[in-house]
Amino acid sequence: MFVVCILAVLMDAGPSGITGQPQGAVREVVAESKPQDPAPAATGGGSLAWRGYFGLEGRLFPHSPAVPGQIRHGLFLVAQPEISYTSADRRHRINATLFGRFSLSPTYGSADVRELYWQYRQDRWSLLAGMNRVFWGATESRHTIDIVNQSDLRENYIGDVKLGQLMVAATLQRGWGQLEFYALPVFRPRAFPVSDDRPRLLLPVKGHEVLDGPPVDVAARVSISRGDGDLHAYYFRGVNREPNLVPVFDATGAPIRLTPNYKPIDQFAADVQYTLGSWLLKGEVFHRITPDARYQSAVGGVEHGFSRLFGGASDIALLAEFQFDNRPDTEWPAPATRGVFAGMRLAVNDTRSSEAKAGVVHDFPSHSWIIKADFSRRLTDQWGLSFAFSGFGNVGRSRALADFSRDSYLTITLRRYL
């Protein structure tokens, strides 16, 4: 019925807009550093293009692991190829993006279909079906309202890296803005690291349970742009992407593992951006209703940009944000409940696309902090090198970070772009 209702209103819509790409927020520079897409190859009536990368990734941990058997250092083969076909009339598009990571010692791996969709575009509307990634949010330090896709914690402990999500989605353009409708028929549980990997929770996470979730998750989103401001608001009804972790005990009463427990939710959320000269004001907030509780989460702050730093070509942005979260202790913990973030982003604007980003989040109630720093640079048109550091400090009182007290790490990645 949801899809039928969408199709019934398609005839009175405007330009299309389902791309699955971020709006407003800045992705990690490690993920964004790549050469321009290659020119598409002609295939009769349409065009075929391929992109992506493969490479080597090393993870270095300065501290010994908290759990026996975990890696001290890791070396991985990583690959993310993407191929897309666009018809001659540019109405049809088929896109496939795969991802794989394989450890060289010890031997284990993970793989996922990030995208595998067909999209049809008209001048006044578009329709998409298949696996896709959709990003919602505006802030830098935390993407609290991003809910369509499930998190892949094997790649990023904070949950910013997402699994592909099966969906049917339609975009309509009206005179006052844009409407998006989503039907998400298959729920995907959160992907947790294997027992050898780091960083991970001290207890292994196995299995999962979904409590009385709807057969199909649904979402509707509205986007309005006026002058220098952008506003997005959505309603989501479905299974919570953040599980409760229920301990399982042995015969002696000692916890031996955690089982994720997923509950149905209703969530209302919004994000906003407003440009004021060289200042960018941005924020996002949600109100979540579960069978057991109602709570809110919000992030808001400012970004101030400086162009042509010291008379050169470099641009720098200074960032400051505040994080708020009042969820109860029974829910998946937030990294910061009353936190502040300060950071910077540097674009050198040289021929090798050198970029850097660094920031610190401090949580006042737990006195914990997280530091992140990224740097990336193209060595040639096809090869790129990146460094990413994640550090945890004074996390003993943090529900979200206490298990990572010995898991600060540096990631070095060498990529060959396709």
Model-derived regions, located:
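N-terminal periplasmic/intermembrane-space "pro-region" immediately following the signal or transit peptide
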Residues: 6-68
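Short loop/turn motifs that connect adjacent beta-strands in outer-membrane beta-barrel proteins
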Residues: 35-50, 84-93, 121-128, 176-178, ...
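Transmembrane beta-strand segments that form the barrel wall of outer-membrane beta-barrel proteins
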Residues: 54-64, 93-104, 114, 151, ...
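Residues that define the transmembrane beta-barrel architecture of outer-membrane proteins
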Residues: 69-77, 109-114, 162-166, 214-218, ...
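Residue-level signature of outer-membrane beta-barrel architecture
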Residues: 83-87, 119-122, 131, 171-174, ...
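Outer membrane beta-barrel
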Residues: 84-197, 227, 394
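Detector for outer-membrane/organellar transmembrane beta-barrel domains
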Residues: 276-363
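Outer-membrane beta-barrel "beta-signal"
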Residues: 302, 404-418
